[in-house]
Design a protein with these regions (language model features):
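A conserved structural/catalytic subdomain of Rossmann-like adenosyl-cofactor enzymes
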Residues: 1-180
Length: 180
């Protein structure tokens, strides 16, 4: 796809990154749109990532200098069921996403990378990954199996399996007795 593909897509993506136009990449959950059930990616492009102060809705906003940075957000685990087969963001989720993005834009000290959710990557990190914009290459994912003692777990599963086989054999014998 456009996030990591080769050929013309690679050339376009590389130019966008080299020209520091990519501000953020947000991966949405699957089944958010009626026309496709695949995960859609939002590219937020910004030609002015320099520090600046501006007015918005009657409030003064300050954006920090985000030159050579890209925010990656993986939103695939967020959202609530809608019309049985679709996913949508509720107000709380929208506020969480918006808060993360705006905090990243304005206050580097308050923003923090969160495993399985968001990561602020530098241009050098993106170049090191050959200009890939696939969020999973940057966002840390937690290996939940890491803390499992394999030998203990395997012994427990084997014991459970032996018990199930014994129960199966007992049930077979009971069935044979009934049908005699």
């Amino acid at each position: 796809g456009a996030l990591s593909g080769g050929g013309e897509e690679y050339k376009i993506r590389k130019k966008l990154i080299e020209n520091d136009l990519v501000e953020a990449i947000l991966v949405l959950p699957m089944k958010m749109f009626y026309t496709t059930d695949i995960s859609v990616t939002l590219w937020i492009l910004n030609a002015n990532k320099k520090e600046r102060t501006f007015e918005q809705n009657g409030k003064t906003k300050i954006h920090r200098d985000r030159t050579n940075e890209i925010l990656f957000m993986d939103l695939r685990k967020l959202g609530v069921a809608f019309e049985k087969k679709f996913i949508q963001f509720d107000t709380e989720t929208i506020e969480k996403i918006s808060s993360t993005y705006h905090t990243w834009q304005s206050d580097k000290e308050a923003y923090e990378d969160i495993a399985e959710y968001c990561k602020s990557a530098t241009l050098s990190e993106v170049i090191a990954k050959d200009y890939s914009l696939v969020p999973s290459k940057y966002i840390e994912f937690v290996n939940r199996d890491e803390n499992i003692d394999f030998d203990t777990k395997m012994t427990a599963l084997q014991s459970e399996f032996v018990e199930l086989l014994k129960e199966e054999e007992k049930s077979k014998q009971e069935l044979l007795t009934v049908f005699k």
